[in-house]
Amino acid sequence: MCSIVEDDFGDEGGAHAMKEDTPQPELGGNELCRKCNTEQAVLKLNQKEPQCRVCFLNYVRHKFRASLGSTKIVRRGSRVLIILTGEPANVTLLDMVRFGLEQDAFKQLRIVPVLLYVDDDFVGNTSEARLQQLAERLQVFKQFESFPAYYTVCGSSRHVALTFDGAFSPAGFEQDEARLLQVLDAVRSVSSKQDLLEQVRKQTYRQIGHALQCAYVFLSDIGVDLAKTLLSNVALGRGCSLAQDVAFCDDRYNTVKLVRPIRDLNPDEVSNYLQYSEQPLLSYSPAKHFEDKPSLQNLTAKFIDNLMQSFPSTVSTVYRTGDKLDAPKAARNECCRFCGAALDYRGSKTLFATEYSRLVSSRINAACSHEDILLKSKQMELDAERAVNGEDDQGEERVLMKQLCHGCRNIFEDLNK
């Protein structure tokens, strides 16, 4: 066994070799801002110089504007659908958009914002709890009532105008809600439930965006969210769409593109922005669906949150790994029917090994002789290869599986037939 640098690894693997980020010195009592050298500093971010309130707000807003300007993806005058959640990062994004629209002609943000709230609180909640959460969210959304806003439920292709006068009621979507709840109830594992809900949510963004004639959808994902997404998608078998799921722009559908303009922000910058903004900003942080149950996504989120406490600079390294990946290009008929990712199953050795193992478990038993095993193994290899490539003719199920990527296949196979 190799013993090179064996002292670096003990019973804890290489964990003890990683050094925690050095705590930054706290802000002095009368320390001046290192940017303008005139105003008193009010905060000091990790690995940054002390800043006053104005310089800090300019710094965060510049990161937002620079991400839009450097990519040149969002065209001037475009209608942009901004997804409402009410969470701190979402409120930060909305306030920066509002601030950009209020600037003079030279610095003005030239987009036409349209807000959309996609309601999925009917999942796992009583009607009373759902209405209570909606009322709390509306108080947060009311801060941006100058923008046109719409309401829909997850999985629906319909939308209605959203009002903030307290009389709004989510009626008329009962069939859409019942259909999604029926599908979720049929899924066995929590990991597949969460993955299914996320994919349906993205489909809803694109459908409503297309209906409202918005070519772009702004999401309020920040760096730590994308780090969780990246590692979760690896575990879920969504490697083919990994680059697009954490990229600045997800353009797998050319008609409506998902844009993440504040992906470079971290939780400290978001919380300080809400604290030091020109006017008080409310936010809402509800519990996520299935958050208290074991799943691949929840385990990954817990790992990233713990990493953020001791090694915050490592989190950005995790999600920026996605920038080094390229999404495979495929024709429209070579994309997953459910999530739109390029189909990745043909010739996959990993899927072949999984399918072959399944066939061995179902066809080989203790009563089989050595000759029978050798004879069956050749046939199982052929059957496994045909199953992976979707070349076996076994009814409508296989026809559908042939049109799904590996990640979506896992959801389908997790359904109670």
UniProtKB/Swiss-Prot annotation:
Major subcellular location class: cytoplasm
Organism domain of life: Eukaryota
GO cellular component, as recorded: cytosol
Keyword annotations of the record: Cytoplasm, tRNA processing
Annotated stretches, region: Disordered: 1-24
One Pfam family matching this protein: CTU2
Function: Plays a central role in 2-thiolation of mcm(5)S(2)U at tRNA wobble positions of tRNA(Lys), tRNA(Glu) and tRNA(Gln). May act by forming a heterodimer with NCS6/CTU1 that ligates sulfur from thiocarboxylated URM1 onto the uridine of tRNAs at wobble position.
This protein's name: Cytoplasmic tRNA 2-thiolation protein 2
